[in-house]
UniProtKB/Swiss-Prot annotation:
Its EC number is 1.1.1.25. Homodimer. Shikimate binds at S15, L16, S17, T62, N87, D102, Y221. Pfam families: SDH_C, Shikimate_DH, Shikimate_dh_N. Involved in the biosynthesis of the chorismate, which leads to the biosynthesis of aromatic amino acids. Catalyzes the reversible NADPH linked reduction of 3-dehydroshikimate (DHSA) to yield shikimate (SA). GO terms for biological process: amino acid biosynthetic process; aromatic amino acid family biosynthetic process; chorismate biosynthetic process; shikimate metabolic process. NADP(+) binds at G127, A128, G129, G130, A131, N151, R152, T153, R154, D155, K156, I219, G242. This is Shikimate dehydrogenase (NADP(+)).
Amino acid sequence: MKQLYGVIGNPIGHSLSPVMHNDAFEHLNMDAHYLAFLVEEEALGEAVKGLKALGISGFNVTTPHKVAIMEYLDEIAPLARQIGAVNTVVHRDGKLIGYNTDGIGFVRALQSISEDPLQEKRILLIGAGGASRAIYFSLADVGVKEIDIANRTRDKAKNLISGCMENVNSHALSLECAAENQGEYDIIIQTTTIGMHPHVEYTPLEIRSLKQGTIVSDIIYNPFETKILGDAKEQGAIIQNGIDMFVYQGALAFEMWTGCVPNIDRMKQLVMRELGG
């Protein structure tokens, strides 16, 4: 019988997940299909019940349901609970189990372009929202010891850090302080929406003086090269946009659902083609 997978959110028409996952199913000769489901906030509980009753094998969760869905699941993985959000649900042994592959997907994407182990790096996160939180706890989970957070409102960065693991050395910084000290970091990760289309002329951090070999990553993928990435490239940095994070988090969800590892390069090429790259 054909296995059913999907994604729930609102809006959902723009989602690239169906194209990416259905191509992977076809490429691996799997009898499965992935659909996008528009779910209103007030209907979330009923939608989750319905998906479970239909025997869905797994599904992704996107805006605005990543936090609210947690109360409707049977189990939540420890890292997802720490992050406080779920983006992937596995239907296993009659239970809906929530995971968060956003942060781990980003970590895998980052590892793919870093010559050295991430555990040896000093990292700066820009922003203190949901994406930053997922990345922060996932970096800590793989053993990164030095992670600072810069945010427009420093108190929000402090709140994020307050839940950190004891073995992580973290500081909450103003954006001005981060700009002054940017040369101290091996990796800078931009997690806000600043610089996203159509406001492409903006950047949360003016890149001025990076150390040699710095990696600058931006979770935005529209445009492919944001202002912060363009400025970093001019400084000789290694740059990475948000396509890698999107692909790696999707590939990890696919692996959790099916036990099969999809072709990352194929997924990335497909997504870039869909985005016009």
